[in-house]
Amino acid sequence: MVKYLSQSEAIELDLDLFEMFHVGQLMELAGLSCADAVAECFPAQTHPRVLVVCGPGNNGGDGLVCARHLSLMGYQPTVYYPKPTLMSLYENLTNQCHHMEIPSVKKCPSVSDAEEDYDLILDALFGFGFKPPVREDFVPLVKMMQETKVPIASVDIPSGWDVEKGKQSECDFEPKLLISLTAPKLCAEHFKGEHHYLGGRFVPPALQRKYQLNLPDYGSKLVVRL
């Protein structure tokens, strides 16, 4: 069985990966994996309009990469990136989205606007470094995801969930799709949605052994269903 990681294990594993790979490499593979999982569950023919919600950390970077790949797969992504990270990596990812003519919005959509304008929300707001409660700046966005009927695909962690314990009283939305990256986190044991995929096919054998990950065989696929 695949190992589910604690928050501290996930952080330590990421630091080990950063010593072996450039963060941009890992982000590119993670974001591509997310796009592939979305395509598996929500085809562009039925869910073309995707709101990609990006947070200020690595999870947001994964979202920007995912938006770019979704546009190449025939989707119509729109990016909402309320707190951009002022580092060259993230600025480059944002510019790449501009070059792909991916539109962005500056204001958090209301529940009614989200349901009128989008067929899917990609939640790339908070990653496994998150600790409750949700920062005040992001409360309206999390509230919208709480209340919307638009299906949600969460990248690695459903935003606002405790990384180990799962849903919190102030944030208990259930995404339709959870895309765990590298290895699933303990909160994924509480996931009750329809689709759970694992992506991030980049963990060297030595790290798989160190953390006893017992990862599934991807074969030629970018993601595997859990």
UniProtKB/Swiss-Prot annotation:
Root EC class: isomerase
EC identifiers of the protein: 5.1.99.6
Keyword NADP: yes
PROSITE patterns reported for this sequence: YJEF_N
Cofactor notes: Binds 1 potassium ion per subunit.
Residues binding K(+), per UniProt: 59, 123, 159
Keywords: Isomerase, Metal-binding, NAD, NADP, Nucleotide-binding, Potassium
Domain YjeF N-terminal, residue spans: 10-215
One of the record's GO molecular function terms: nucleotide binding
GO CC, any one term: mitochondrion
Catalytic activity: (6R)-NADHX = (6S)-NADHX; (6R)-NADPHX = (6S)-NADPHX
Cofactor(s), names only, from the UniProt record: K(+)
Binding site for (6S)-NADPHX: 58-62, 127-133, 156
NCBIfam families: yjeF_nterm
Function according to Swiss-Prot or TrEMBL: Catalyzes the epimerization of the S- and R-forms of NAD(P)HX, a damaged form of NAD(P)H that is a result of enzymatic or heat-dependent hydration. This is a prerequisite for the S-specific NAD(P)H-hydrate dehydratase to allow the repair of both epimers of NAD(P)HX.
Protein name: NAD(P)H-hydrate epimerase
